Each structure stands twice: as structure tokens, then as C-alpha cells.
């Protein structure tokens, strides 16, 4: 996917978010979702007429919802990568994020995929927001970075009052190739939180991807009109359920001094043919039991 090839189109995805807590009590939920998959370098060269960007609309995208709040979120991402010594992310940059609907958006987690000119992955940035208005990014890079490979990072950012700020995230990203301008595909992101060597939280977002069309936008507004508005409500609703299950509330720590923390090198031998495979099968999802309200409990 060369940066100067034919511009790629914005995509929209429809799927499901899933979450399961394993200890000290079990708690699980799943909700339908829609999301955007935006080729930001292509959109910089040729804006998409269907995408309502940085303007009022029932369904759209606002750059200021990401990064440091500037009007060009791609410029922020490029500066972040340059500051971290990643100089070869010269291909497409895809942003997987929740849309802004009817003027509202809360984005617990977004995923930035920065490619080289030959289409390989140079870096993945996991951008996490909490309900206190704070934001932190986990940068995943290094030799062997690829779809389908298990990646990891130490948890340093507070998200849930029912989870301590410790442990390790295990990430696995799967996505079909979107190099063709009008290609459909599938994506799946799985995130596990391990504490003291045992899994505590299992989350995922997966779904089908298709070109962003006016018909697809109408379908999203018709089937999920209140999706972005109820994300925060669902977070508090499930927090109440956990409190009723007698889970102790953990005080909010001071946020990390650095806005970006680096993950570990990809796990050797953890890649598979799933690197470009569609989202997990029902059996795979059942085995992992992931879910999240776009993952506020990326906790």
C-alpha cells in the first residue's frame, strides 16, 4: 500500500464488542457496534465525500477526539512516531475508531496502524481514554511486528476503578488486506490483561469492513442511533454491577508522566497464518471469551 498509490477509501465496520472478567468474580457482556477504519494519508490527499470530517453531522469523525486534540490527528501521530525513532512508517496509516454520532463521542480505545511503503507494519499505537478525561498511548513496534502475532505491554494507565494499574496486556490484531480501493474485509482485535501471571480480563472488537457509503451511514444511524451516547452509561452500569458483586473500589492513581509507553518486542514464534485472516471463528471467540464496551475495560 504505497503512500503515493491510488488513494484508498474510508471504511465502516459492523460487528461486536465483547468483554469478560474472570476474577475474583465473573462478569461478561457483549454489544453490537460500528466503527470507522480510516486511511488517513489517502484522505489527506483526497478527502472522502461521504465522511463528515470536523463538521456537524449525525455521523462523522473529528480529529480533535484523538492525540493532543489538534485539527490534524495524522500530524500528531507522525510526530509521535518520529519522536520515538520510527522513521520508516511512510506508507498508509489506518485509524480504527468509534465514530462521532449526533455530536457525541467517547472513545475508550482506538487503534492506529502505521505501515511502511511496502505495506508491512512499522508500528501500532493503542490510544486509550478513561472517564476522567485522561489519555495514554501504548506503542507497539519492533522486528517481527505483524498481524496475528502476540504483542505485549505493561499496563501503566488507570482505566477501571475495579482494576489496579499493574499487570500486562497481551494484544493480537487480525485484519484482512485493505490495499484495494473498494475492498471489503474483516478485522478482530483481542486484548487480554494478565495480572500475576493469570488472565484477569479478556476483551475484543471484531466485525466486517466495507466501503463507507451513504447507505452504510444510514444503516448505522438506523440500527445503532444511540451507540456513542450509551457507551459511558454502559460503563457506569457495569461498574454498578461489579460493585454489587462486592468488588473493592480502587482509588485513581496519578497518571503516568509520559503520554506514550512502549510495548515489548513481538513474542517469538507467536505469528500464524491468521495474520491476514478474517476475525476469529465462533469457536475461537468462545475460547477467548473477549468483549468490551469498545473496551473501557481495556482496564
Specify the residue positions occupied by each region the protein language model found.
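Mature, function-bearing regions of proteins
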Residues: 1-299
Amino acid at each position: 500500500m504505497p503512500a503515493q498509490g491510488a488513494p484508498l477509501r474510508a471504511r465502516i465496520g459492523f460487528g461486536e464488542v465483547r468483554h469478560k472478567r474472570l476474577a475474583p468474580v465473573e462478569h461478561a457482556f457483549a454489544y453490537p457496534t460500528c466503527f470507522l477504519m480510516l486511511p488517513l494519508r489517502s484522505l489527506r490527499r483526497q478527502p472522502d465525500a461521504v465522511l463528515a470530517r470536523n463538521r456537524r453531522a449525525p455521523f462523522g469523525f473529528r480529529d480533535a477526539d484523538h492525540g493532543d486534540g489538534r485539527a490534524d490527528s495524522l500530524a500528531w501521530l507522525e510526530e509521535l512516531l518520529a519522536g520515538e525513532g520510527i522513521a520508516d512508517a511512510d506508507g498508509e496509516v489506518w485509524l480504527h475508531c468509534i465514530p462521532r454520532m449526533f455530536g457525541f463521542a467517547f472513545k475508550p480505545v482506538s487503534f492506529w496502524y502505521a505501515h511502511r511503503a511496502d505495506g508491512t507494519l512499522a508500528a501500532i499505537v493503542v490510544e486509550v481514554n478513561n472517564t476522567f478525561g485522561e489519555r495514554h498511548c501504548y506503542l507497539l513496534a519492533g522486528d517481527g511486528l505483524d498481524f496475528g502475532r502476540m504483542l505485549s505491554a505493561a499496563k501503566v494507565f488507570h482505566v477501571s476503578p475495579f482494576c489496579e494499574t499493574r499487570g500486562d496486556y497481551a494484544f493480537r490484531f487480525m485484519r484482512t488486506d485493505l490495499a484495494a480501493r473498494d475492498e471489503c474485509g474483516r478485522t478482530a482485535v483481542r486484548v487480554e490483561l494478565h495480572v500475576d501471571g493469570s488472565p484477569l480480563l479478556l476483551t475484543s472488537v471484531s466485525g466486517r469492513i466495507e466501503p463507507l457509503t451513504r447507505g452504510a451511514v444510514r444503516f448505522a444511524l438506523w440500527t445503532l442511533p444511540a451507540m456513542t451516547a450509551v457507551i459511558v452509561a454502559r460503563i457506569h452500569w457495569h461498574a454498578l454491577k461489579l460493585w454489587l458483586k462486592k468488588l473493592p473500589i480502587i482509588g485513581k492513581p496519578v497518571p503516568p508522566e509520559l503520554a506514550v509507553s512502549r510495548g515489548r518486542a513481538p513474542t517469538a514464534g507467536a505469528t500464524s497464518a491468521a495474520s491476514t485472516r478474517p476475525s476469529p471463528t465462533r469457536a475461537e471467540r468462545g475460547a477467548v471469551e473477549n468483549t468490551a464496551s469498545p473496551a473501557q475495560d481495556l482496564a
